[in-house]
Amino acid sequence: MSIGIIDYGVGNLGSVKRAIELAGGETSLIKNPLDAEKYGSLILPGVGNYTECYNKLKQNNWVEFFKKTFDSNRWPLLGICVGMHLLMDKGYEGASAENPTPGLGLIKGVVTNLSDQGCNKRLPHVGWNSINISSNGEVPSIFTGIHNNTDFYFVHSYGVVVEKASMISASVDYGIDIVASVSNKNIFGTQFHPEKSSKAGLALYKNFINIS
């Protein structure tokens, strides 16, 4: 079945769509959650401010969909950049310390500024950087055939802190170890942008297509 790219008014949707097609997948933009049944899997992109992205997701009824209807056994899901952030329980970008913005709660974790995680390097973290695939003896399915220390393209000042280390599928060194990818059964997230990551990004998208 085709992959639905969630169009809620943010993200470089055209680039993601073209990359999926180059990787051999069929895909369409999807605005209405009621149309999710037409698709075998979903991609949640995201660029910009976490709180603004969450609010737009909510305005377009996707938060309700993920809270009440979504089943990862039915729809494998890939969150990209801020899309990965939205998988968490809450985030502080664009919100106060006393009143964080909620997330979808699909993966136990929180979104914080990298400086609050101990990063002393210049932010945002922009450019190519090699990832460390933390397979625990088994390569996570979206990294099948992708070698450890492969370079991917990053653009971010915020990152996720997850409750369970077992859900970290890859990390990246930027002064500190930053979560580069998460996975929980059929739910995946990448901090980097596969659509901007040349052949490695296409390989990752092809793996997601094969999961779908």
Question: Regions from the language model: what does each represent?
Answer:
Residues 190-212:
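Acyltransferase
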Residues 48-126:
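Cysteine-nucleophile active-site neighborhood
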Residues 176-183:
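Short, surface-exposed beta-strand/loop micro-motifs that present aromatic residues
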Residues 27-38:
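Short acidic low-complexity segments
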Residues 149, 183-187:
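Beta-strand-turn-beta hairpins that frame and shape the catalytic cleft
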Residues 36-46:
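Short acidic/histidine-rich motifs immediately flanking catalytic phosphotransfer sites
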Residues 92-173:
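Pocket-forming structural segment of enzyme catalytic cores
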Residues 1-4:
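Extreme N-terminal starter segment of soluble prokaryotic enzymes
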